[in-house]
Amino acid sequence: MVAVLADEALYEFTGGEPPTLEQLQNRYAAQVVGGSADGAEWWLNWMVTRRDSGASVGFVQATVRAGTNGSVADDSVADLAWVISGPHQGQGLASEATGAMMLWLRSHGVTRFTAFIHPDHGASQAVARHQDFYPTDQVHDGEIRWESGQPASQ
């Protein structure tokens, strides 16, 4: 994944820089735990590979927060994110992978989804729209919160 994430253009909207091998190993070691120590969050991190070649092209991830009753699988919300390397963008891979993750999460009781997207990141906005997300008025760290479903006014 170091080579996949090496393209500096991937960080145009999110900030940061390509991770080193050591940074990526440390990140994955923390993520493989699968959730917070108190059980209030699940962490899913799926590598996206091409079906035709098996080549790694990016990832899709979810942070699932517990709902009002404290259970992750009931009344919970999943914050989603996706990254696809430059040469593989625009082919529907992020939409397909995100949709697959949402399907899996729904099968485990998650019904609400969000994503935080930079206002100028048209490609990520297209992925969100493909999943029936809509932009809200909420902004966090310069990114707009998108939510699944229909806006409250509809």
Residue ranges, per PLM feature:
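GNAT-family acyltransferases
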Residues: 1-86, 104, 108, 116, ...
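Conserved acetyl-CoA-binding loop-helix of GNAT-fold acetyltransferases
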Residues: 62, 82-83, 90-107, 122-131
